[in-house]
Structures are given as C-alpha cells and as structure tokens.
Amino acid sequence: MDHKLNLKKQFACIYTSDFFSGLRITDAVWVALLAARGFSLWEIGLAESVYHIVSLFCEVPSGMAADLLGRKKTLVSGGVCMVLQSLLMAFASDLFTICFAMGLNALAMTMFSGTTTALLYDSLKQEGCEEKYIQVSANGSQISMLANAVGSMASILNQFLGYAGFYLLNAAFGGISALANLLLAEPIVTESQASREKHPLHALPEQFRQLVRDSLHVLHTCPMAGKLIASSALISVPSYLTKMFLQQRLVELGWPTELLFLPLLLGGLACVAGTEVGRRVRCRSMRRLYSACALLCGVGTLLVGAAPAWGGILGMMLVQGVLEVYLLHESQKLNDAIPSDQRATLISVDGMAYSLLMIPASPLVGAVGDAFGQAGAGLALLGGAIMLSGVALLGKKPQRS
C-alpha cells in the first residue's frame, strides 16, 4: 500500500481529542445532580440500565461500522452524539428524555471504544512502526486520564454552574473533541480499506455479513484473541463498581457533593501512574501478568468494600492503577493478533464481553450488600472472585508471547 501519513499531525489530533473528551465534568456528580432535581434512585438506576443495554447492543455494530465505513467517520459521529446527549441532559425535564440522552451517551461511547484503538494502531502500522503502540497509547491514556481528573474537580463549582451549566460545558468540550477528530487522516493498510469509498450503499448488507463471517473465523482460528478478550472483560468488572459504590459509601458517611471529586481525582492520578508503570513493564507472559494484576485488583476491591473511607479510596486507586498496567499490554497483544480489516469489530467484541459481565454483576453486587446489610459485602465477594481467577492461572504453564 503506497499511502503516506503525517504521524505528527495524527498524534496531535488524537491527543487533542483525548484531552477534551476526557474532560467529562459530569462523571463525578451526575447522580447527585439528578437526585437534586427530584429524580428518585430507581429512576436514576433505570437511566443507568438504559446506558448498559444500549452499550451491549451497539458495541459490535459500531465497530463493524468503523471497519466498513471508516474509523474517522465513526469517531466524528460519536462526537456529534456526545454533544447532543449533553444538550439533552442540560434541558431535560422528564425521565424519558434523561433515558434517551443516556442512550445517546452509550452509543457515542461504543463508537469511540474500539474505533480509537483501531485508528491509532493502523496509523502506526501504515508507517511500519507498530512497536510504538504501547508508548503512543500510554501517552493518549495519560492525557485522557489527567483531563478526566481535572474535569472531576468541577464538582467544586456546583454552586456556580448549576445543573444546566455542567452539561452545557460538557457539550462545548465534546464539540472541540469532535472537531479534532474531523482533522484526522483515515489510515489505509489494506486494499479493502483503500476501496471503501467505491462500494455502493446497496452492497453494505453483504459486506456486514462477510465481516461477521471473517470476524468469527478470526476468533475460531486465533484462540489467543478469545483468551485476551475474556481476561480483560473479567478483570475490568471492579473498575466501575468500585468507583460507584465508593461514591455511595462516601455520601452515606456524610461527604458533601463538593468533595466527591476527590476520589475520582485520586483514581485518575492512579490511572496515570499505572499507565506509566505499564509502559515500563516488559511483558514476557500474559498469563503471569494477569495473575499478578488479578490478585492486586481483588485486594483493592476488598478494601473498597470493607475498609474505612480512606482505605476504600486507596483500594479504588489500586484497582484503577493495576488495571491500566494489564489493559495496556492486553490491547497491544490483541491488536498484534487480529487483522486490520476486522480490527475495530473485534476490539468491540472486547467491550461487549465487558458489558455482558457488567449487566448481572452490578445488581448482584448490590443484592449481596442488601442481603448482608452491608454495602461492601458484594464488593468483598467480587474481590474474592477476581483473586481466585488470578490464583487459578498461577499453577499453569506460562504462555510466552
């Protein structure tokens, strides 16, 4: 393929998009904002359920769209959806609009999830420097995490911004991110990608069917890809749940809304530190790396569930940091194992596997907590399960990669 790419400009656009998309200033306070407007906990829970359902059903189709129609188009479309959902949330007055906006948010996130990774890896592959993926990916992750940590501090502006102000500022940041994606170049590494614009619309259904067949063939003939997908889905389950239940515990302990940014800020800094460790770790065996990371994630989850407030915050930080180490190397190995024409689709399968585990895990953790009368009981059980998954691999022969 004779296509040249300006990697310096490409990275600048990616990093700019990472920064402004990372400034999600509503993440730390969206539950509190809705509750303050009179929405009940079951209504807020319903909106969260809509988010996960849309994520589940749109994860793989969005990846397929990225592979067939182009990664740049998909990222820009996701940015538009993100702006629209913020505007809807800013002026929503009923549960239906809130749920619709949450669905748009989920759709946007599915468009970003596998597509961003695929575009970055193939940009490097086009220039023959895939070995730089971990370093470049780590840079983008750290920029996004630092932005997320800064954005979480917006909760201290609760009295000045108000409900609508949070989401209008969110929409502005999302718009800048979408503009940065608009300046990206579409990487071309295969003949199929080079001929995307030549395919008529009526050929799309057959292309989708062929993409499904090709993706299933890759999963069947490459067991390593399936193992990596399953491992990342399992070890990632505590990521959101530890943050969610920690926020709930801190509110119950009397923490004001203005201070809820603190655990998210510290969690973001832990992610940055974890990414820095991850880029310096030389992974000789994914099996050993998973075992070590699963044991540490399990310990962190146990701390969130059983320790006092600051012990819980430290546990959440441990979970977030360790996950970044594992997922950075898992992403590299998965990209190395799969072909470019199915890259976004198969990375989206990775995300779908996580959603499939989260749908039962979230209510189960809550139900265990209710049954024992202790909010942390469910997290303690989850932490034990994650630790057992790591122990189960310790006795097996490491697989070198």
Predicted regions: what they are:
Residues 1-8, 186-229:
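Juxtamembrane intracellular "pre-TM" segments in multi-pass secondary transporters
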Residues 2-57, 222-265:
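Helix-loop boundary and gating motifs at the non-cytosolic
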Residues 170-199, 394-401:
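Helix-loop junctions on the cytosolic side of multi-pass membrane transporters
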Residues 103-145:
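Cytoplasmic helix-loop-helix junction between adjacent transmembrane helices
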Residues 80-94, 98, 295-308:
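C-terminal ends and interior cores of transmembrane alpha-helices
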Residues 56-93:
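Conserved MFS/SLC helix-loop-helix module at the cytosolic interface between two early adjacent transmembrane helices
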